């Protein structure tokens, strides 16, 4: 990329690209990442309480059935899937407004919506089970709507704040907070259910059908678990409101290079030339809309690649997470439903979810953070899809054998989670935040993420039907279908180029170059990309102290 003093890019953007990692970046990761912590907690805690909802609201008094009450297939799919529908719509709406109004202006709205609807979910009361479940679904939809907005905004903000050498790690670190949220969903559910178990002893379902429901204590438990999701969102809101607009949006979209330079001088201890004349030429070369032949020529294949891979990944990833409760009995991690009471079953499901997340899900996210700017996004995504496909195929074919060999089953199951997160679950989030021009970056990330949530909806309303009630033949079929899905993701990855080590303007072609290259080409490697010591040893520095951060946040 050209130098700032005579090249095609703006000095303020070059300064961001070559700035050393400082406290500014760390604070931004935490602020954006806490949104993803909340997202994951809110989306995945429903899996730990859905069986409890079935016992409480779908088991009539005086029941003589051999098994406790369970949500109907329709109710189960709605309770779990409605938040995903809301997420898809929220991604598209907030992604669009993130480009039209600014990243910062709509960023805090997502947290307020998440906090309010998490509380509303726990306060879902009604005179009948239909009223309770219907009210819960209403709040879960709008909770998902807020969660959806966090995807394109957090990814875009982090990519536009980052330097080019460690941009992948920064964006991946924001997304890795999803892993922490999944762990806490299991941990909080486990703690709350265990506290209520201590003071509310009850026989198993076999011992006494009615007493095993543990009413009214059990009715408080699921409500508390859902409402706890509001606290991290509220705790982060103040800091989000203090974040400055990204320099890239201010300069390129608002057309105010002087303001962008002034903002960054409060964050970077340097003098930056405003370059208003260069900005006019810069914008003239990039003033094409999303729905244009120019965009299709430059980025059409890239958008197809990011949408298809995220769609296919989320079919597998959400199937894994949302159907855990149905697969755990086959792995020997939880007792049969009739052998335990309501809160003991919830505790066992939560404990199993926590262990799988801690040992399989969580490490994969952070291995990606460590290696994404060394191996590249492209290779990590290929490896992840391939390994997920192989492990799921093995589990599907050997399912009957694995049911009696719990350790091996658990190991294979955990490895699929590891390679999902050290793989496409992380990279499909990172790549759309880097590939597309500033003018449509948030929208394109939103379209890609919405395609992913469409895959999650397929998982919730389709794959879940196969695993419902832990039927052996159906689970085997589901695992083989997911193996094929992952292999398709492997092949569609060839449409997505490598972005490692280059500036956002170079990747998107905004600096006058041709952009990221054709689909399937690891463009960074082909272009001889690398970051020299001089790129990161310049005098531009982010503030090291929290005082300087506070100053920059008020800019």
Curated annotation (Swiss-Prot):
GO terms for cellular component: membrane. Induction: Specifically induced by the mycorrhizal fungus G. intraradices colonization in roots. Residues 512-521 have a biased composition (Gly residues). Residues 522-535 have a biased composition (Low complexity). GO terms for biological process: phosphate ion transport. Residues 544-555 have a biased composition (Polar residues). Residues 50-77, 127-130, 189-216, 320-351, 399-408, 464-477 are extracellular. GO terms for molecular function: phosphate transmembrane transporter activity; symporter activity. It comes from the Eukaryota. Residues 1-28, 99-105, 152-167, 238-298, 373-377, 437-442, 499-555 are cytoplasmic. NCBIfam families: 2A0109. This is Inorganic phosphate transporter 1-11. It comes from Oryza sativa subsp. japonica.
């Amino acid at each position: 990329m050209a130098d700032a003093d005579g090249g095609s890019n703006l000095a303020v953007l070059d300064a961001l690209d070559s700035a050393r990692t400082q406290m500014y970046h760390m604070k931004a990761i935490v602020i954006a990442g806490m949104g993803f912590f909340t997202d994951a907690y809110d989306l995945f805690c429903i899996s730990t309480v859905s069986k409890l909802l079935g016992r409480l609201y779908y088991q009539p008094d005086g029941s003589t059935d051999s098994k406790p009450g369970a949500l109907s297939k329709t109710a189960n799919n709605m309770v779990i899937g409605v938040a995903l529908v809301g997420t898809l719509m929220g991604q598209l709406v907030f992604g669009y407004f993130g480009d039209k109004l600014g990243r910062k202006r709509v960023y805090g709205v997502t947290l307020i919506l998440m906090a309010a609807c998490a509380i509303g979910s726990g306060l879902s009361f009604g005179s009948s089970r239909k009223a309770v479940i219907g009210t819960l679904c209403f709040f879960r939809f709008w909770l998902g709507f807020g969660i959806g907005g966090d995807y394109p905004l957090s990814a875009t903000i982090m990519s536009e704040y980052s330097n080019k050498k460690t941009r992948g790690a920064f964006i991946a670190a924001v997304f890795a907070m999803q892993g922490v949220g999944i762990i806490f969903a299991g941990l909080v559910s486990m703690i709350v259910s265990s506290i209520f178990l201590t003071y509310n002893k009850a026989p198993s379902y076999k011992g006494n059908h009615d007493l095993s429901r543990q009413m009214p204590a059990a009715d408080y438990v699921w409500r508390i678990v859902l409402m706890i999701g509001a606290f991290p969102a509220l705790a982060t809101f103040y800091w989000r409101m203090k974040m400055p607009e990204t320099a890239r949006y201010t300069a390129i979209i608002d057309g105010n290079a002087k303001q962008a330079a002034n903002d960054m001088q409060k964050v970077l201890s340097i003098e930056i030339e405003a370059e208003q004349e260069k900005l006019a030429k810069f914008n003239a070369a990039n003033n094409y809309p999303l729905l244009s032949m120019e965009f299709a020529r430059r980025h059409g294949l890239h958008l197809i690649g990011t949408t298809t891979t995220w769609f296919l990944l989320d079919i597998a990833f959400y199937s894994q997470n949302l159907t855990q409760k149905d697969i755990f009995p086959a792995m020997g991690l939880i007792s049969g439903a009739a052998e335990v009471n309501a809160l003991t079953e919830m505790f066992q499901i939560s404990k199993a979810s926590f262990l799988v997340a801690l040992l399989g899900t969580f490490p994969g996210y952070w291995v990606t953070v460590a290696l994404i700017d060394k191996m590249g996004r492209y290779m990590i995504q290929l490896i992840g899809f391939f390994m997920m496909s192989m492990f799921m195929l093995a589990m599907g074919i050997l399912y009957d054998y694995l049911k009696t060999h719990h350790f091996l089953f658990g190991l294979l199951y955990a490895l699929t989670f590891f390679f999902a997160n050290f793989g496409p679950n992380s990279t499909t989030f990172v790549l759309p935040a880097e590939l597309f021009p500033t003018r449509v970056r948030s929208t394109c990330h939103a379209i890609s993420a919405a395609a992913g949530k469409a895959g999650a909806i397929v998982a919730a309303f389709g794959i879940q039907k196969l695993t419902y009630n832990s039927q052996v033949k159906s689970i085997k079929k589901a695992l083989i279908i997911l193996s094929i899905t992952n292999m398709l993701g492997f092949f569609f990855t060839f449409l997505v180029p490598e972005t490692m080590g280059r500036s956002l303007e170079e990747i998107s072609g905004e600096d006058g170059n041709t952009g990221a290259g054709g689909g399937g080409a690891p463009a960074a490697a082909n272009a001889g990309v690398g970051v020299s010591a001089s790129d990161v040893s310049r005098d531009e520095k982010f503030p090291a102290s929290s005082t300087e951060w506070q100053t920059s946040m008020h800019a």
